[in-house]
Amino acid sequence: MNVLSSICYGGDYNPEQWPEEIWYEDAKLMQKAGVNLVSLGIFSWSKIEPSDGVFDFEWLDKVIDILYDHGVYINLGTATATTPAWFVKKYPDSLPIDESGVILSFGSRQHYCPNHPQLITHIKRLVRAIAERYKNHPALKMWHVNNEYACHVSKCFCENCAVAFRKWLKERYKTIDELNERWGTNFWGQRYNHWDEINPPRKAPTFINPSQELDYYRFMNDSILKLFLTEKEILREVTPDIPVSTNFMGSFKPLNYFQWAQHVDIVTWDSYPDPREGLPIQHAMMNDLMRSLRKGQPFILMEQVTSHVNWRDINVPKPPGVMRLWSYATIARGADGIMFFQWRQSRAGAEKFHGAMVPHFLNENNRIYREVTQLGQELKKLDCLVGSRIKAEVAIIFDWENWWAVELSSKPHNKLRYIPIVEAYYRELYKRNIAVDFVRPSDDLTKYKVVIAPMLYMVKEGEDENLRQFVANGGTLIVSFFSGIVDENDRVHLGGYPGPLRDILGIFVEEFVPYPETKVNKIYSNDGEYDCTTWADIIRLEGAEPLATFKGDWYAGLPAVTRNCYGKGEGIYVGTYPDSNYLGRLLEQVFAKHHINPILEVAENVEVQQRETDEWKYLIIINHNDYEVTLSLPEDKIYQNMIDGKCFRGGELRIQGVDVAVLREHDEAGKV
């Protein structure tokens, strides 16, 4: 679903922070900058409803009309991101409570319990009032529900949540005996006889039952999703043709975005990579993840910053050109919109030093606004990209419930973190410009040739069969250490590790050897010696062949990496955390077998992605280096640079440092 027929460009707009004369100035500046969409009213509950049941829309009417008169459309917020002071005063028990029993007070934002009944009642009234007010306004193009759900309060442990949790558990398990079985409550004498004996996993003397903790992750995710769906139901009823979304936050642990994405019309998300980290690999990974949530549907980058944020210890600015560069890198991975937080930099409040499209002091030479305007004018030329897709032959399994489970306490290695392991594999694809999707273990895998499963600790019923069929039909499955260990309740799969994946991989893991942070071992393969860290599996072969063996320690000579033929395909098991050199070589060998090639052969730190429509192919090339690079395009093609409009024959192409090229591909006859 496209919000506009062009690339969306703009940012969060908070006119309630400014006098009316600034509104007109803002609209003119937006017009000059090429802004066509702003997110409006996100934190305006206290302004729209200054007292219980009393609504004031006059100011918002005027703002929307001014913007529309200047060609700016509205992504209208439902204003539910922060409850007003009058609501908190009237319903003090609506404030969230943490695991230690501490009440989180008013004075910040997101200070509400998602299961408070009066919160839900008041949200319904507010959202319906806003929807009815603006349902026929031609400026309305999209709904922005709440804001960054769970960003600050992902779990509440109050009595309202306790009651709701018991109800959720009863619906899930039906009987208390089934819950006891699934949670393993005979351990440490935790057995329950009645539902009302169960509480949220509050602060306890020592380790909490991990099955209970895992279910509380699920419960809170469902509780917050229910809030979103409460609003969406009203918006769909009143404005059935207006797309509804809420802004995600990439690899945000508390919310299962694969589940959430089924309920939004378009994925939108917020991204704030640190300029100090250089090459924005995790930003690229999150763009690919966000695109994958709705099976490749283009998304909108709802928030980024023009220069610097305010919430890190040290908030360095993006150097000149980097905001533009990273924006194009986002478009390259499937974005149909580039938005910012925020339009005008705040004068007061907690984010007054957070960068914006219009800084505190604006003159004709201001670098930030100049770059904002340049990008806005360029994006007007890229309407052709709207709706185009990315085709990938490689997928990485990413599973939120697996993430929750693998990072619960009481593991062999309690410093293991899921995202760095996923990123280690992704990094090798990124460096080689191999397009990649993210999938769940239960998703349809038939269009992929290679599927990578980093630390798939949890394998739920049926997921192993999906992976088994993928391999049997000719795919390559690459599985990392500490995979196939538990079921959906964090109960160990009996019969040996890696549980239901043993037959696919042709191995048996006898023991785990977690490494201290300073320990480095070596692995041998037929092409050299490589470092490995973090973990070693003691592997016994059950039909697989070793691709690499450990050099040191008491398990020297035992397999570290294995390959097993299964059906028409193969299962590769990586029983350690090898260095980038080894992972890269391993993946290159697999890709060569499947004839998976980079889109272009390019210099280091040059990012290339291809977006496609039924008619055209578009190459988006980003030079992250600060120096010029030269690359070769096929000489039998004609290319059009969509930014400057020039056409040229393939061959040598030069791209300046910190610069981009967006090329439409033609054949000799001028067609795809």
Curated annotation (Swiss-Prot):
> Which family is it part of?
Belongs to the glycosyl hydrolase 42 family.
Keywords attached to this Swiss-Prot or TrEMBL record, sorted alphabetically, are: Glycosidase, Hydrolase, Metal-binding, Zinc
Q: Which domain of life is it from?
A: Bacteria
Describe activity versus pH: Optimum pH is 7.0. Retains more than 80% of the activity at a pH range of 6.0-7.5.
Instruction: Name the residues annotated as catalytic in the UniProt entry.
Output: E148, E303
Record protein name field: Beta-galactosidase bgaB
Which molecular-function annotation in GO is an example for this chain?
beta-galactosidase activity
> What is the applied biotechnology use of this protein, as the UniProt note states?
Has potential for enzyme application in low-lactose milk production during milk pasteurization.
Q: Where does substrate bind?
A: R109, N147, W311, E351, K352, F353, H354
PANTHER family in the cross-refs: BETA-GALACTOSIDASE GANA
Cited function: Hydrolyzes 6-bromo-2-naphthyl-beta-D-galactopyranoside and o-nitrophenyl-beta-D-galactopyranoside (ONPG). Possesses a high level of transgalactosylation activity. Hydrolyzes lactose in milk.
Annotated InterPro entries: Beta_galactosidase_C, Beta_galactosidase_Trimer, Class_I_gatase-like, Glyco_hydro_42, Glyco_hydro_42_N, Glyco_hydro_b, Glycoside_hydrolase_SF
Organism equals Geobacillus kaustophilus
UniProt-listed Enzyme Commission number(s): 3.2.1.23
